[in-house]
UniProtKB/Swiss-Prot annotation:
This is Elongation factor 1-beta. Keywords: Elongation factor, Protein biosynthesis. Promotes the exchange of GDP for GTP in EF-1-alpha/GDP, thus allowing the regeneration of EF-1-alpha/GTP that could then be used to form the ternary complex EF-1-alpha/GTP/AAtRNA. It comes from Hyperthermus butylicus (strain DSM 5456 / JCM 9403 / PLM1-5). Transmembrane segments: none annotated. Belongs to the EF-1-beta/EF-1-delta family. It comes from the Archaea. Signal peptide: none annotated. GO terms for molecular function: translation elongation factor activity. SMART domains: EF1_GNE (SM00888). Pfam families: EF1_GNE.
Length: 92
């Protein structure tokens, strides 16, 4: 079964947000068939960092990335998200 890799940037609502804790909050909200395979902290400006998330989702996800986007937006501490890339991967 093919899966989809979604690369997103998550912008926190404040520079004081602990990004490691934010990732844990996000993981706790994701369905069991969604998986964060990697995340990086990306400097933005003036001490503000964003998270670059690499999330594997099922290819059959209805609505493409919209469900993932809704979940990410619902997490406390997330100001904005941006989907950067979507790739189909055959094996994972």
């Amino acid at each position: 079964m093919a899966r989809v890799l979604v690369v997103t940037t998550v912008y926190p609502s404040s520079p004081e947000i602990n990004l490691d804790e934010l990732v844990e909050k996000i993981k706790s909200k994701l369905p069991s068939d969604y998986e964060i395979t990697r995340y990086d902290k990306v400097p933005i400006a003036f001490g503000l960092n964003a998270l670059k998330l690499y999330v594997i989702i099922p290819e059959e996800s209805e609505g493409g990335t919209s469900k993932l986007e809704e979940i990410l937006q619902s997490v406390e501490g997330v100001e904005e998200i941006e989907v950067e890339a979507v790739h189909r991967i055959s094996e994972y």
